[in-house]
Amino acid sequence: MRPMPAIATLLAIAMLLANAADAVAEDADTVAQDQHAMSYREMADTMQMDDTTRFGKVMFDQLEWRDGGADEGRAAWDAQGYYGGDYDKLWIKTEGKYVTGSRDAASASDAGGRVGAGAGDSGIRDANVEVLWNRVISPWWNVQAGGRQDFGPGQSRTWAAVGIQGLAPQWFEAEATVYTSDEGRTAARLKSQYDLLLTQRLVLQPFAEANLYGRSDPAHQIGSGLADLEVSVRLRYEVRREFAPYVGIVWLRRFGGTADLARAAGGDAHDLELAAGLRVWF
């Protein structure tokens, strides 16, 4: 038996396998290029992915007690929830405070610098609820539109809301919303936060929120322009991802007319509070 035919046969098989591998690679490159040019919906259809499934989530990002070192304390919350599909969702947000004790009116104001009648009494201070339609416009950003209703002492207000939220570069969560009220008033709110993982369970979260108003509203202790800036840092321990106690510090600075109105009411242009609470979601 001569070895040459066997070697030739092996070489022929190797060449066939190499050609087949090249063809598979070319097909994969073509598919990848086609998918890169597809829209998200076309890609989902091509890959036979079901993008009509409905799902939801509720998160209390801040559910805490704050103490500024005086006779008054306050419970505060910042929560949101959504339900819908991959592209469109119903999105609900709420935030506010429940004040106890008898500190002065200006110190009983919320992060927007607002105070209502009887602000020295216990009760809800300037809570609000937003009901929004959420639409995905990119892998990182959503556009939102809907309405906001304010609650608490004094005259309540109804606002139309349009905004955008998502992940900015370096994984900062960012949110910007503009409002117009049924009385022609305008406002804007900017928020940003970032999760810095110290360990797999210990997370440091810086947070910032700024509120701006188109015109003064003395009844709610609001001046025009930049009304206030809240900056806080919270350190949480994730017992589970969905359950994390935390401690933190919250600093609020009022500006311009809002600071003047706070001083006129006997308060300060800034507050510094310690916070302890829970971050939960389900």
Feature locations, PLM:
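Detector for outer-membrane/organellar transmembrane beta-barrel domains
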Residues: 156-218
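Outer-membrane beta-barrel initiation region
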Residues: 24-106, 113, 117-122, 127-135
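Outer-membrane beta-barrel translocator domains and adjoining extracellular loop/strand segments
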Residues: 72, 103-111, 117, 124, ...
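Residues that define the transmembrane beta-barrel architecture of outer-membrane proteins
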Residues: 54-56, 73-77, 125-129, 156-160, ...
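Outer-membrane beta-barrel "beta-signal"
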Residues: 233-238, 268-282
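Residue-level signature of outer-membrane beta-barrel architecture
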Residues: 83-85, 135, 166, 180, ...
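Transmembrane beta-barrel strands of outer-membrane/channel proteins
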Residues: 62-64, 92-96, 145-149, 176-180, ...
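Repeated loop/turn-to-beta-strand initiation elements of outer-membrane beta-barrel proteins
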Residues: 87-92, 139-143, 170-174, 199-204, ...
